[in-house]
Amino acid sequence: MSTSLPPLVEPASALSREEVARYSRHLIIPDLGVDGQKRLKNARVLVIGAGGLGAPTLLYLAAAGVGTIGIVDFDVVDESNLQRQVIHGVADVGRSKAQSARDSIVAINPLIRVRLHELRLAPSNAVDLFKQYDLILDGTDNFATRYLVNDAAVLAGKPYVWGSIYRFEGQASVFWEDAPDGLGVNYRDLYPEPPPPGMVPSCAEGGVLGIICASVASVMGTEAIKLITGIGETLLGRLLVYDALEMSYRTITIRKDPSTPKITELVDYEQFCGVVADDAAQAAKGSTITPRELRDWLDSGRKLALIDVRDPVEWDIVHIDGAQLIPKSLINSGEGLAKLPQDRTAVLYCKTGVRSAEALAAVKKAGFSDAVHLQGGIVAWAKQMQPDMVMY
């Protein structure tokens, strides 16, 4: 199936003398040339997130001369971001990611315009925001935002480039419900339903090899330039799958699913994706303790079994003194339940409190009715009780 598309953007009227000098290596490419560079100059591209995928994509789109770049990010730079989010530096830790990204972009190319949207993308603002741009790029790492971006792009009539990464793997594609010649597909044609909560970890939980971000982001940026200028064949209707350990790329055809309901409105995506599973939320009700409460329990000599449900690689980085490692996967399979002591109150913890709530549901179903989990996980414990603790 051919996915050649007409140019998404009309060309600007002219290039300045400075622009001709700056983009000269583009101008001498026959398929791109002056016309293509004028289209890049006139383009308005919105990038969702200045994180692992957004960071290198923003840098290359800016260097390529995309005339207006919008950045959606409400987060601040954390030291753990620097391993892969190359648009930020040590001096930016604690700063707004959007502002840090803007400063890096301006340092590379002062000829373009950068618009900041320091907000949380939500059903109340997504469609109106998308209508201000020609093209959207989504590299977010949670399913609620991915489905929101997809549905808002459909309602706004906008194409978007999507990418994702996990450990040593990456994926990328182009979605555009209203693409010409009946080529339209959207994210729900590939993934009609989100996976069960907890099945697919985020980068914070599962990790990612930092340089994988550059590989996938370069594909995303390339697709953006192809869409804007109308050159080549895009990934519309195809999923690109990258495996860094095998150093392989393969593509999978995406076809329109006629059974997928038509998107007519935005919904509550946290609820739709079940960010926390229903049984986990139910188990945590009345069975959640704060770091302060755990400290008091430990100091009082209460009989506890402190259970770390994270993966062994996380345990090796840091753990709470006196804890026992029983990964959530072993608890869910039943193998780890036999390791839980019967004569003490089990206190489960993970990194941020999500996985421990999910493990708590399995523990309670097994008869450990007095088991509890730690609110906010080891991150909250470190911040409130042990600020000198190493954190990842």
UniProtKB/Swiss-Prot annotation:
Question: What CDD domains does the entry give?
Answer: RHOD (cd00158), ThiF_MoeB_HesA_family (cd00757)
What domain of life?
Answer: Bacteria
Q: Which GO terms describe its biological process?
A: cysteine biosynthetic process; cysteine biosynthetic process from serine; symbiont-mediated evasion of host immune response
Annotated membrane topology is: Single-pass membrane protein
Does the record bear Phosphoprotein in its keywords?
no
Q: Which Pfam families match?
A: Rhodanese (PF00581), ThiF (PF00899)
> Membrane-crossing residues?
45-65
Q: Which SUPFAM superfamilies match?
A: Activating enzymes of the ubiquitin-like proteins (SSF69572)
Q: Name one GO molecular function term.
A: ubiquitin-like modifier activating enzyme activity
Which cellular component, as a GO term, is one annotated location? membrane
In Swiss-Prot or TrEMBL terms, this protein is called: Probable adenylyltransferase/sulfurtransferase MoeZ
Which organism does this record belong to?
A: Mycobacterium tuberculosis (strain ATCC 25618 / H37Rv)
What does the record give as the organism's lineage?
Bacteria, Bacillati, Actinomycetota, Actinomycetes, Mycobacteriales
Underlying gene: moeZ
